Design a protein with these regions (language model features):
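Domain-level signal for soluble alpha/beta catalytic cores
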Residues: 1-278
Length: 278
């Protein structure tokens, strides 16, 4: 994919490449696969002159993710990412335009047979609320809201870009009708900070928690962003995430099938220990 290219268009133009990537994660032990639709709202696709293929791109993504399981049990999560701007009154994008774009994407994902919609890497509760309403209107069987927090310069405190705390985010998502409270990506969010954020979610709501941290902190090498945390290093934080209340654990930027394979091993080991103690 060339820099600035439209990866979501690969669902139609290079489906076997997308399938190979997702199959690698399924083979590594993933129970859930997120569709290749993070930037597949019409607003985002229009920037690549792909808007007219919005529905086809989203439907194809669901089919590819389902195929990646190869007949094994698994959950397909239809991904809705940010639309890449700010809604009025903070920005110049009309709320009605975002409602229409998210509504179209949610309807395409639901009609294609997703098991849940995940609305991820959100920093604005207003935008998240529009996406949740779109998922509800489309009849999504399960809705996961997932916020992206940034670690502040001093200490371990985190906020979204718009200043939202984990407690505020958890309360909003629960009230808005999410079935799962998620956190993913962000700046300076490693496994330890992710576990702390999950505990803060838990202090507000008893809903299930999903955590997808990055593979450590990014560094710039030869004009490329590199995440150096190895599968073993990242997996060492899985028990703390489980103890904090996370029930769905994955990886975001920098994570690979090798990371997920180690996650799977740790989760299975913890489950075995829990059964042995029961």
């Amino acid at each position: 994919l060339p820099p600035g290219g439209c990866g979501e268009a690969w669902n139609l133009d290079a489906p076997e490449k997308v399938l190979a990537i997702q199959r690698a994660y399924a083979d590594a032990g993933s129970d859930c696969l997120i569709t290749n639709t993070f930037g597949a709202s019409r607003i985002m696709l229009d920037r690549h002159d792909e808007g007219e293929r919005t529905q086809a791109i989203n439907r194809a993504a669901v089919e590819i993710a389902r195929r990646a399981f190869g007949g094994r049990p698994g959950y397909v999560l239809g991904d809705i990412g940010p639309f890449g701007g700010l809604m009025e009154p903070y920005g110049d994008i009309p709320v009605a335009l975002v409602e229409k774009a998210f509504g179209e994407q949610a309807e395409a994902l639901v009609s294609a047979g997703i098991d849940a919609i995940i609305i991820e890497t959100q920093t604005s509760l207003e935008e998240l609320g529009v996406a949740i309403a779109a998922a509800q209107a489309a009849g999504a069987p399960c809705i996961i809201g997932s916020m992206a927090f940034d670690r502040l310069r001093e200490g371990d405190e985190v906020r979204t870009m718009m200043g939202t705390s984990p407690e505020q985010a958890a309360a909003f998502m629960a009230e808005a009708g999410c079935h799962v409270l998620g956190l993913n990506c962000g700046s300076g969010i490693d496994m330890r900070i992710a576990a702390d954020t999950a505990r803060r979610y838990r202090s507000v709501s008893g809903l299930p928690i999903m955590a997808q941290p990055n593979a450590g902190l990014p560094v710039l090498e030869n004009l490329k962003v590199i995440y150096r945390e190895t599968p073993d290093e990242m997996a060492a934080g899985v028990p703390a995430l489980l103890d904090a209340g996370a029930r769905i654990i994955g990886g975001c930027c920098g994570s690979t099938p090798a990371h997920i394979r180690r996650f799977r091993e740790i989760v299975d080991h913890v489950r075995h220990q829990d059964r042995a103690r029961a």
